Amino acid sequence: MKQESVQQKNISIMSSFSGSRKVYVEGSRPDIQVPMREISLSPTTGSFGDEENQPVRVYDTSGPYTDANADVDILKGLKPLRATWIRERGDTEEYEGREIRPEDNGYKGKEKASHSYTGLKRKPLRAKKGQNVTQLHYARKGIITPEMEFIAIREHVSPEFVRDEVASGRAIIPSNINHPESEPMIIGRNFHVKINANIGNSAVTSSIEEEVEKMTWAIRWGADTMMDLSTGKDIHTTREWIIRNCPVPVGTVPIYQALEKVNGVAEDLTWDIYRDTLIEQAEQGVDYFTIHAGVLLRYVPLTAKRVTGIVSRGGAIMAQWCLAHHEESFLYTHFEEICEIMKTYDIAFSLGDGLRPGSIADANDEAQFAELETLGELTEIAWKHDVQVMIEGPGHVPMHKIKENVDKQMEICKEAPFYTLGPLTTDIAPGYDHITSAIGAAMIGWYGTAMLCYVTPKEHLGLPNKDDVREGVITYKIAAHAADLAKGHPGAQIRDDALSKARFEFRWRDQFNLSLDPERALEYHDETLPAEGAKTAHFCSMCGPKFCSMRISQDIRDYAKENNLDEEKAIQKGLEEKAKEFKKAGGSIYS
């Protein structure tokens, strides 16, 4: 891969949406600039009266890639937005960091990764001795950080509300001090429901440039966080390219890379190898780690009678290690030491559900809930260290069993944020699992899940490409927004109301621009009504001009206005006039 190809690949998507522009809302200090996408609307005219429609501002995750005025260079990485805030606190220090070794990228001996990241090189940061640099620690001390104020503006709440939710453990701010490029965001049930998009190469397919492109593509469509699940060669370098160019938090499953370092043999894993991998990724800037510390030796037999056994890759790795050594998981026995690493860099736990159900037949079984009890125990240990925690959840769960998952998680894990994969509500739709899971995602988001991990049409079938990523993100944005509406999140309905008004007034361009996928909406409209005149027509292709329900409604309103009647009387008077016309014409149905 040539460096130029990475830059060229990403330039192709560095554009704003039609009818939109990037705006920034300033906070209490000049360097708090909160990005939003402002959608311009055309005025209401004609029979609807003359009225200016105010632009609509929406939450934006796309970073500088959709800012026409931003100077983005993939080779250098994004600007370190939070660097000043981190430095001002005075509790961090630079140090040399660990040396990058060939095995970090899956190579042996002197063989090196084929594509090093040649951009901006910084020494990593860590907490000074005796210091804790987590947002949870600051929140519990009563400190409102610039990150919290930034989030408050994004979420339309007060900074104190953000601080209190973080201090209570009900919300987390994933924000590794070595990822200053990230724009602060929050994951918690009292905020917008967030979505995560998974990317990553494998030994079978994909390259560094494809993964960087998928990242910029996913955040364009609304991904709030990214997980790099790479398992092939160049793991370290792929992650470096992604993090240096990513404006949203990045998560990983460190056991994947640790396994690569022992040639894929689970029983050869050791605590020392895993610990070294945690520090390697911490220095790069990973914001949250999925750690399957709840998979205990005694729980493994509980999966024996399942239809689909253990389907979590991380869960299966640790189960295999436990059985091979007949010992308790080193993730569990060394959990306090892991907490020390996490608070040194402000990395959040995403406590993995290694025993999640992989089929609806296995949903809500003994193995799943036994692990959840252990995750509750680990949550309290992490909180003792002021380390941020969210809990991962299923999986495959039929609709009538979804609420029990949320209720149990809230109780056992003391309201720590819940982060679920779907869940998929049926197992019979390979190729359409973005839909089967979005049904469950909307429901579980409504019940209180804070973040939804997207599912693409390729789930269970193959690695997603760029188009699959878009499909998955949009599908999950729909689910998350539906949950926000159901929960009554402040301002959630503004965009819906604006689009409904535009639809009723046949402002087609505004309808396209207000939608989650403006390009798809325009494309579908053009398939049947491609002419430019159709963009101002007072009907659509569904019913045509004579039978358009909204046009008929407007005609009734116009008739009422002309005859000084309310709408109900206008309908009755109109019917009477039509009856007279019918009788005058001879009263025959067929003439």
Curated annotation (Swiss-Prot):
Binds 1 [4Fe-4S] cluster per subunit. The cluster is coordinated with 3 cysteines and an exchangeable S-adenosyl-L-methionine. It comes from the Bacteria. [4Fe-4S] cluster binds at residues 540, 543, 548. GO terms for cellular component: cytosol. It holds the Pfam family ThiC_Rad_SAM. It is an enzyme of class 4 (lyase). One of its GO terms (biological process) is thiamine diphosphate biosynthetic process. Keywords: 4Fe-4S, Iron, Iron-sulfur, Lyase, Metal-binding, S-adenosyl-L-methionine, Thiamine biosynthesis, Zinc. Residues 35-55, 91-117 are annotated as: Disordered. Zn(2+) binds at residues 396, 460. The keyword Iron applies. Substrate binds at residues 198, 227, 256, 292, 312-314, 353-356, 392, 419. GO terms for molecular function: 4 iron, 4 sulfur cluster binding; carbon-carbon lyase activity; zinc ion binding. Catalyzes the synthesis of the hydroxymethylpyrimidine phosphate (HMP-P) moiety of thiamine from aminoimidazole ribotide (AIR) in a radical S-adenosyl-L-methionine (SAM)-dependent reaction. PANTHER family: PHOSPHOMETHYLPYRIMIDINE SYNTHASE, CHLOROPLASTIC, THIAMINE BIOSYNTHESIS PROTEIN THIC. Belongs to the ThiC family. This is Phosphomethylpyrimidine synthase. It comes from Bacillus licheniformis (strain ATCC 14580 / DSM 13 / JCM 2505 / CCUG 7422 / NBRC 12200 / NCIMB 9375 / NCTC 10341 / NRRL NRS-1264 / Gibson 46).
